[in-house]
């Protein structure tokens, strides 16, 4: 345990030390310079040692906010643990590197045979795992269909007589479809090729209100039902 002095200056120095946190106070007392605090000189030496250690522990940020010289090179402090936040080569080094490259190119070009770059030797990257990225040599060619071949085959299969008969005949359904188109060109357009375009009259409204004949059975049913109800109430 350190020994403390009883003088007024010693008390003031201890009060200054107590302004710091408890952890710093305990750490300062454990140092070798703060073991004997009976004299003022020892107290001053202890305070100086604690201040030096505290200033060494505090982080130094780039900038002249405290009017102190920077201890680190500001080029190193820009999140150097990331690849994209590092500074590039300096102008002097880049200029020197470019000059060396030019000199090497001139010496290589003096022989008249420029050295092929490694990229020229390699095959250009083509996305062969995609259909549209395959090179020209492996391009899929579309299958060509020749209509003349089909006509020749059909001509061989059917003789001339059957072929003339097929050309002269036309299906009945085709004539029925073509005639209404010419007749109803001026009239309103009806969607007759769908089921719901023009339903037959006997199936409109569920088949109940198509004609007077279809209404009579429904009226008789209502009459019979009313008569039965009247007889039941009379009994």
Curated annotation (Swiss-Prot):
The modification Phenylalanine amide is found at residue 87. GO terms for molecular function: G protein-coupled receptor binding; hormone activity; signaling receptor binding; type 1 melanocortin receptor binding; type 3 melanocortin receptor binding; type 4 melanocortin receptor binding. Its main location: secreted. The keyword Secreted applies. InterPro entries: Mcrtin_ACTH_cent (IPR013531), Melanocortin_N (IPR013593), Opioid_neuropept (IPR013532), PMOC (IPR001941), POMC-derived_peptides (IPR050878). It comes from the Eukaryota. This is Pro-opiomelanocortin. Disulfide bonds: none annotated. Residues 88-128, 169-209 are annotated as: Disordered. It is found in: Secreted. Belongs to the POMC family. It comes from Rattus norvegicus. Residues 112-128, 181-205 have a biased composition (Basic and acidic residues). Pfam families: ACTH_domain, NPP, Op_neuropeptide. The modification Phosphoserine is found at residue 154.
